[in-house]
Amino acid sequence: MVPEAKKKVLRFLIDTLNKNNIPFQVSGGLGAITYGATRELRDIDIEINKENCQKARELFKDYIVEDFRRYSDEEFDLWMMTLDIDGVPVDINQVEESYIFKDGEKILLPEGLIDTEMKSIDGIEFPVQNKKNLVDYKQMLGRDTDLTDATEMLATGQ
């Protein structure tokens, strides 16, 4: 589910953020995998507070594909920076002012790094968006992969 190359990048991200005292949470597919989803990991999604975006930009400047920007499409409206670390795509999102669109409605996502749960993959420990919020988010998005993730997450006791 999580290939060694992606685990190596995950370790680097976690070590860098922790060493520089930047609170964060993992969300998206990796978050779902820690709660029992069985799909292959495409990218790594990390959320940080707005106050740490500039610091993160400096720390990861050598890996930036797209700098922090307002990203908006038919599904999302949020601030994010995209990195490529050793071929692994990484999205670092600002946790505040993040929205999804559902049935034409713009919905504000929970703000702040609250109620995270410490999870681990092969001894790599990191805070993950809490299961309820992640399941709710994936169900609201309604994409096939997200619905499968939500179903698998709910079916496990992880």
Describe the function of each predicted region:
Residues 1-25, 155-158:
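Helical scaffold of the NTase/Pol beta-like nucleotidyltransferase catalytic core
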Residues 9-10, 34-40, 44-47, 76-90:
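Accessory recognition modules or surfaces
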Residues 13-44, 49, 55, 130:
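Active-site nucleotide-donor binding segment shared across nucleotidyl transfer reactions
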Residues 15, 80-81, 116-117:
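Residue-level detector of beta-strand structural context in well-folded domains
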Residues 18, 84, 120:
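Anion (oxyanion) recognition and catalysis
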Residues 56-63:
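Short amphipathic alpha-helices in soluble, non-transmembrane regions
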Residues 66-100:
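Conserved catalytic core of two-metal-ion nucleotidyltransferases
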Residues 104-158:
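Catalytic cores of NTP-dependent nucleotidyl/adenyl transfer enzymes across multiple folds
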